[in-house]
């Protein structure tokens, strides 16, 4: 998988892609990966795809709540953000000095060593 836990990503597709500022300019939403669901190929991104969960009261004296929380989005809808250029970019893998490294395809800079 091209995304790792803690990576800063941009939303590149879907209803959560843009937010408009006060001037009407569209800004791509970004967030940090909180959790990865490998089998479903989904990720949980901080502050993205907020849904409301209705919680029923557990006891008679308790009240029910409406809780805001993040919902998972598909892995294909996110792209890693290049830290130097601050743009979403694809990620590749290559072998350098007998180590597998992850790198940005646009700039060619290495993200991390995997071994």
Swiss-Prot record:
- Keyword Cytoplasm appears in the UniProt entry: no
Q: Which residues form the signal peptide?
A: none
- Per its UniProt record, what Gene3D superfamilies does this chain match? 2.30.30.30
Keyword rRNA processing listed: no
Function field:
One of two assembly initiator proteins, it binds directly to the 5'-end of the 23S rRNA, where it nucleates assembly of the 50S subunit. One of the proteins that surrounds the polypeptide exit tunnel on the outside of the subunit.
Oligomeric state and interaction partners are given as: Part of the 50S ribosomal subunit.
Q: What is this protein called?
A: Large ribosomal subunit protein uL24
């Amino acid at each position: 998988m091209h995304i790792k836990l803690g990576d800063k990503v941009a939303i590149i597709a879907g209803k959560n892609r843009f937010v408009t500022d006060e001037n009407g300019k569209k800004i791509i939403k970004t967030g940090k990966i909180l959790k990865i669901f490998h089998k479903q190929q989904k990720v949980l991104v901080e502050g993205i795809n907020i849904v409301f969960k209705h919680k029923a009261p557990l006891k008679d004296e308790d009240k029910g709540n409406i809780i805001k929380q993040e919902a998972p989005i598909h892995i294909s809808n996110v792209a890693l953000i290049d830290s130097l250029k601050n743009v979403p970019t694809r990620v590749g893998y290559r072998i350098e000095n007998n180590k597998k490294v992850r790198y940005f395809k646009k700039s060619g800079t290495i993200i991390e060593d995997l071994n």
